[in-house]
Amino acid sequence: MLQPKRTKFRKQFKGRIHGAAKGGTDLNFGAFGLKALEPERVTARQIEAARRAITRQMKRQGRVWIRVFPDVPVTAKPTEVRMGKGKGSVEFWACRVKPGRIMFEIDGVAEDIAREALRLGAAKLPIKTRFIQRIAE
């Protein structure tokens, strides 16, 4: 699964997701993409599950680009532990996704296969998404 190789600090504040995405809103690599429509924290497991669903549907043809990276450590205290005594340990890594952000791009397959692959990938994500494609020039 995706996670940073090293970080400056082990733990982070929770933070909030405000506004729309500034960058990463256009297709840069592939002909088809999956665009986020809601703000949400997407975990590394969800990104990996979506990637597997997409590549399985494409039958290993074409190419997949993951345009988001889980760089936010999410901490949790063990169950039945009293409050206090410091912050919990890092449980998993997540990525803050803003509306308008391209999450996945694919290329090298027909539109109907791409549409179905991204639909199956979107089912693994906790947000509403939209299928987009590059405008023919």
Swiss-Prot record:
GO cellular component, one term: cytosolic large ribosomal subunit
Ribonucleoprotein among keywords: yes
Keywords from the UniProt entry: Ribonucleoprotein, Ribosomal protein, RNA-binding, rRNA-binding, tRNA-binding
InterPro entries for this protein: Ribosomal_uL16, Ribosomal_uL16_bact-type, Ribosomal_uL16_CS, Ribosomal_uL16_dom, Ribosomal_uL16_sf
Keyword check for rRNA-binding: yes
GO biological-process terms attached to the record: translation
One example GO MF annotation: rRNA binding
Quaternary structure note: Part of the 50S ribosomal subunit.
Protein family membership: Belongs to the universal ribosomal protein uL16 family.
Role: Binds 23S rRNA and is also seen to make contacts with the A and possibly P site tRNAs.
NCBIfam families: rplP_bact
Protein name from the UniProt record: Large ribosomal subunit protein uL16
Organism: Chelativorans sp. (strain BNC1)
Lineage of origin: Bacteria, Pseudomonadati, Pseudomonadota, Alphaproteobacteria, Hyphomicrobiales
Gene designation: rplP
